[in-house]
């Protein structure tokens, strides 16, 4: 009986050590995870769900690799619709101007954000879809620590962020050959759909 207790104790200590090690590794890999999301979008498109959490404030609910880039917007009333490519291009262009004049929350640290959240354009640009569609403004955000932090915070919760990192990481390893021919913002391509039909109807 004592041997069984000893084995259980050793197993528990080993398990706790493994969990603690993983947590510490996760703390130090904030930028690595952001790079994974941004670089993995190279090889494919992205399906992104953005939800309005308060008037004018948005979060990324989920995103994962897809053959085409598509963004679903869910408003406060629960209505879902697919953003057209024209809408997304306009939002990204508007956000690029804000980055240029220093008013974008994406390039501010957390203490400087006064609105309490990200706008639709900021949230879109923080997503994998933004990495693909906003390829022309990559140099404005490349290696920006504040952007890396805001990108992580753009998700509805930590598990959604980690799930996204994992899905793009997995997809990136299986399609690394095709990513070699892409270039641009975070190495992103420019695949996108222009569908404006309703989602889930």
From Swiss-Prot:
Compositional bias of type Low complexity: which residue ranges? 170-184, 191-201
Q: What is this protein called?
A: UPF0323 lipoprotein Cj0371
Family membership noted in the UniProt record? Belongs to the UPF0323 family.
Transmembrane stretches in the record are: none
- Lipid link (S-diacylglycerol cysteine) located at? 27
The UniProt entry, under InterPro entries, shows: UPF0323 (IPR020913)
Enumerate the HAMAP family for this protein: UPF0323
Q: Where does the protein principally reside?
A: membrane
- Key words, A-Z: Cell membrane, Lipoprotein, Membrane, Palmitate, Signal
Lipid attachment (N-palmitoyl cysteine) is at 27
**Membrane topology per the record?**
Lipid-anchor
Where, per UniProt, does this protein localize? Cell membrane
Annotated Gene Ontology cellular component terms: plasma membrane
Signal sequence range: 1-26
Q: For the region Disordered, what residue ranges are annotated? A: 169-201
């Amino acid at each position: 009986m004592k041997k069984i207790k000893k084995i259980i104790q050793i197993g528990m200590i080993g398990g706790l050590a493994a969990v603690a090690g993983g947590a510490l590794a996760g703390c130090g890999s904030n930028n690595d995870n952001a790079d994974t999301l941004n670089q993995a979008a190279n090889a494919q498109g992205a399906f992104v769900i953005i939800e309005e959490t308060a008037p004018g404030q948005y979060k990324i609910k989920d995103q994962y690799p897809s053959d085409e880039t598509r963004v679903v917007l869910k408003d406060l009333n629960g209505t879902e619709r697919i953003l057209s490519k024209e809408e997304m291009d306009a939002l990204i262009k508007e956000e690029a101007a804000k980055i240029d004049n220093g008013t974008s929350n994406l390039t501010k640290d957390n203490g400087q954000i006064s609105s309490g959240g990200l706008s639709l354009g900021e949230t879109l640009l923080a997503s994998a879809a933004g990495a693909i569609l906003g390829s022309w403004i990559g140099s404005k955000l490349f290696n920006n620590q504040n952007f890396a932090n805001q990108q992580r915070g753009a998700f509805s919760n930590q598990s959604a962020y980690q799930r996204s990192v994992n899905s793009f990481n997995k997809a990136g390893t299986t399609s690394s050959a095709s990513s070699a021919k892409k270039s641009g913002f975070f190495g992103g391509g420019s695949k996108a759909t222009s569908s404006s039909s309703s989602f889930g109807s």
